[in-house]
Amino acid sequence: MERSGTARQPQLLGQKKDKFWLTVGLCALTAALFFLPFYIIDGGFFHYAGDFNSQQISFYRYMNGFIKGAGYPDSAFTSVHNTFSWATDLGSGVMNAYSFYLYGSPFFWFSLLFPQGWLPYLMVPLLVLKFAVAGGGAYLYLRRYVKNIDYAVLGACLYTFSGFTVYNVFFNHFVDVVALFPYLLWSLDEALYNDRRSWFAFWVAVNLVNNYFFFIGQVVFLAIYFICKLSTRDFRLTAKKFGLLAFESLLGVAMGSILLVPAVLSILQNPRTIDLSSGWGFLTYSKVQQYLAILVSWIMPPDSPYLTSIWSEGVIKWTSMSAYLPLCSLAGAVAYWKAKCGDSKKRIVGTCAVFALVPILNSAFYALNSSYYARWYYMPVLVLAAMTVNALEDHNTDLDSPARGISWLMIATVAFAVVPVQDSDTGSWSFGVLKNPGQYCAVLGFGLLGLLLYRYLCQKWRGDSRFAQRLTAAVLAFAFLFSVVHIGIGKFGQWYTDSDLVKQDTNALLLKNDLSEGDYRVDTYKIHDNIGMWLDKSCLQYFGSTAAPSILSFYPALGVKRDVRSEPELSNYALRGLLSVEYLITTPEKQTDFGNEADDGWEYAFAKDGYAVYRNTNYVPMGFAYDYYLTQTEYEETAKATRANLLMRALVLTDEDAAVYGKYLTHLPEGRREELYYESYVQDCRERRATAASVFQMNNSGFHAEITLEKENLVFFSVPYDDGFTAYINGQEADIVEVDEGLMAVLCPAGENSIDFVYQPDGIRLSRALTLGGIVVWLAYTAYFVWRKRRTKRA
């Protein structure tokens, strides 16, 4: 007799008993229902909190227009179009800036079928689609491991509405990964068990294109998955099978490398990598609470991404730390664990648990990124769902005792609510260390209620032929209720600060048409993130992790923090002149605060469309020349607080570049490195303005400038340096000099000069060749196996 939980030939799509489309429909309907109350409250423009509001809505809307050419015009100099985004921080290559977020997502490309203005209202329908696709993929994977196909439907719902997925609605594009991953694992199983060819290569390519960052983790997980299954002899491995699998792996990577090569070259310039000298940090987390949080995240429903119920230490917020299965938690998986010996699923989950508890192993899922994340948990969650349905289907498995045990573990967390605490300052005593008692009660209540209902259903209906269907209905009802509460806690927790989000975003579209013509940057003061994207303007306030890497060196050199956002303080007034900021935008309610903080360089321009606009009297058009320079070594010896002032006076060259280009400028005297006051800044702006380009035009592949010089000199542009740029002076290619620790300059001769900077992602030619070549090979490879299969049938 075949063991429960082992691989078997699945039903094919279209057969009478197959329930693929039923699963897709159930997942879509459930997702639509729990989003519906918020969709109605928000009038169709669903906004949540944090990253969803600031990034995801803005990115989807902006990129829809950018791809369609709705932003800056095409360059008249080149045939290269739609490669450079001015609205992304100080300007960034669009492929590298958005390949982590959406550039390779099939859901984003599907959204291009709709007008740009619809996108804020399509965020929920797109999420519903993602949940539906996730359910379909999980069903395809799980049906191999069950006897009754209804259990595959149940397992798919457990995966689709896991704590990980619901939590990551906050990040939106993480749900894309959850949706597509099951197809990758299904195709691997098809290759291992059924010798089915080409599908694995296809899904490798799709997942790689969708998100290169998550794909790194998928490679690690697939290696664990393959080795664990091989170690338990779940399939027969031959040299031919291994060779074909390796070939399809490489072929899939080749097909999916269109975004990979440019992304890798960009990441190599990004300082957010692991510190290889961390010693104990390889093996242990610095806070005990981190371990407790990891363990609890596998058994209890998740907190809101930006609110913790219990933990006061460790890296907890925004980490996607949840492996919770709706209703049953790990009860079914633990039951399976106790019932099976030498099972591959146990080894996979056990290995993942070890990886979760060891920092260096956990970071392996993110190419040794130094920041802690748990954004790979969706992969073991799929295996946990398989273990759960296998335990439920096997009538000999004890389901009740694991459920009771996990219930007691949940109840044990009440200790955090009643432990006595003495205030170190007053000496008074209180009870509990909870950070958000209300959320904790909701999370604990759902966890215990789910297990109680799970035990009741198992005791009452386990012997019934419709047990799986009844449990599926309970899981979906539970998922609906918990998702409404979970999203509600996150959404209404920021309702006061985000209630005017829609108004500000839509008003920005009106203001876009009322700002003066010209190509300049803007700044904002105490309004919502990424308003510059709605204005289609480069803005100093920007929230996004993957802007041009040189920005991550330019800002810190000035003492401006740059991690996942750019937000130079208003007190750093000299940055506004250096970066060619002409207008600052705030709301009428914040005008008094702005007036108290701002320097004398702002004059009131007008109030319109719900905004108050100020003009920078020290505005310097983009593209200007200097009289002085100083070396990077000298620059690093100056005080960070006044470096922006210094950059208005002198160009900073590396020691090597100073030896080449220093002859065109005068070395800045030591005495002039200290006279860095507002009054001297105004004079420096006046001098730079006198040397500025007469024409500066932004386009969607870079920019064009025209300038007249009295002598041969470097012309500076406050555009982030990127290896993808090529500069042309009067039609001739010229070298680009990296200056000011991250910006650009180019040497121009005396007289009139026409300057064009054209951007193509570094490595794009190689990536295109790999992708096109891979597709050709894959088509031939697939055609061969289709032909062979038909010939075999005829024979």
Where are these regions (language model features)?
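Start-transfer (signal-anchor) and selected internal transmembrane alpha helices
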Residues: 1-40, 244-245, 452, 466-476, ...
